[in-house]
Every structure is written in C-alpha cells, then in structure tokens.
Amino acid sequence: MEKLNGNPAWMVQALWNCCLVNMQVYPVKVPNWVQKLIPSALWHFPRHEKVLYLSFDDGPSPELTSWILETLDQWQAKATFFCVGENIDKYPHLYREITLRGHTIGNHSYNHLNGWTTSNKHYFQNVARNAEQTGARLYRPPYGKLKPSQINYLKKHYQLVYWDVLSGDFDVELSPDDCLQNILRHSRGGSIVVLHDNSKSAKTVNYVLPRLLEYYIERGWELRKIDPNYGN
C-alpha cells in the first residue's frame, strides 16, 4: 500500500479532505497535525524573526497585478507570486513586470488543476508545462489539493510550498476587514500567507494589502519573498 510519511495514502487524503472540502469550510490557521502529513512541504519559516512571507496565487491578472506591485513598492516589500501558466500567456507584460520588480515566481500549474479530480499523467504534464515557461522550482498546488501519489512524485522534482495562514480573500461571505483580521490574528514570525491575484479577490485585496503592510512594517517587520532556490 502506498504511504506518505508512514501513513496509508487513504488516511492522508481523508485527513486533508477534512481541511479542504471544496474550500467551503477552510482553516485560516493550518493545524500542526496537517502540516506533519506532508513534512517535505514548506509550510512556514523559522518563528524567531519578525518576517512575513506574502504570496499571491492565480495571477497575473489585469484587474490586480499592477496595483499589487505598486503597493508593494510603496512599502519596499517583496512577495512570491504563484502564477498560472495560461494567465502568463494571456498577460505576458504583467508577468514580466512581476519579475522585473524582483519578486519570486512560483508554479501554480498551467490550467489551475484540481489534483483530486485529475489523472496523474495529465496533472504532471500540466505542472511541467508551467515549469517550462517559468523555470520555477517552487510549486503550490491549486486549492492545496494533491493525491498522495502526486505528492510523492512532485516532491522529487519541485519544492512543494503550502502555507500556514489562509486569508480567506476568496470567500464572498467574508468582509474585507474580517479577512485582514484573519491575517493579523493568526500570523506569526515566519508565516506564509495566501492572498489571490484575481478578479474575485480584487475588492478584498485592495482593502487588505495596504493596511497589512502598514501594520507590520510600522512595527519593524520585514515582508520577504521566498528564495526561488529554497530546498536545493
């Protein structure tokens, strides 16, 4: 029987399912026991420094990318952008702008695939297609959803990057201020925070990002990107 971290594959997927059921109910703060299910993944950095790692999934997007970049520049902050390959092809000028501004690029598959509902062969080809575009070693699965067999394959070829704070900016029932409070309440030194670079999250991110940057930077924190060679 296939295993992951010593646990049967069915058990690992069942436990992870409990945390990511269609993203209708989601953990803002990822429990430690969940992080231990995939120990090869990066969930957060050491806790002793006043450093926060912002990450933006799904871009580039014409609605939000340029504004995010300008806002980060205003505060001299860096971030990591997990880009979708088809969006890179649609908006190459925005993708170039992310790289020119010195941020880290991560792989978020070519078509934003759900690993639970996609065959391994198709999924791996889709991830590789993005890797050919970006050269990125860091990989974040869309929705966080991977089968144990996919984890076991991908961790040999990429550095899996998850998160320990999920802002909820995609949640239409969550107010922008509640999203901000999610981050402020649950982030610790070394936290990796997920926000989204897409039209659905634009209103919330427009509210959250400048307030988030002001809060942390005025308190002496650094907003840092993930090293693109992390795990090498």
Task: Please place each PLM-identified region on the residue numbering.
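His/Asp/Glu-enriched short active-site or ligand-binding loop at hydrolase and phosphoryl-transfer sites
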Residues: 16, 145, 151-186, 220-232
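Alpha-helical scaffolding within the catalytic cores
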Residues: 37-40, 66, 88-99, 141-150, ...
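C-terminal domain-boundary segment and adjacent tail
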Residues: 37-47, 74, 89, 203-232
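Acidic-and-aromatic substrate-binding clefts and catalytic sites of carbohydrate-active enzymes
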Residues: 59-63, 82-91, 113-121, 140-146, ...
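Active-site beta->alpha N-cap acidic-glycine motif
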Residues: 25-107, 111-114, 135-136
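CE4/NodB-like, metal-dependent polysaccharide N-deacetylase domain
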Residues: 69-78, 103-104, 110-113, 120-148, ...
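A cross-domain feature marking catalytic cores of carbohydrate-active enzymes
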Residues: 56-58, 83-85, 107-109, 141-143, ...
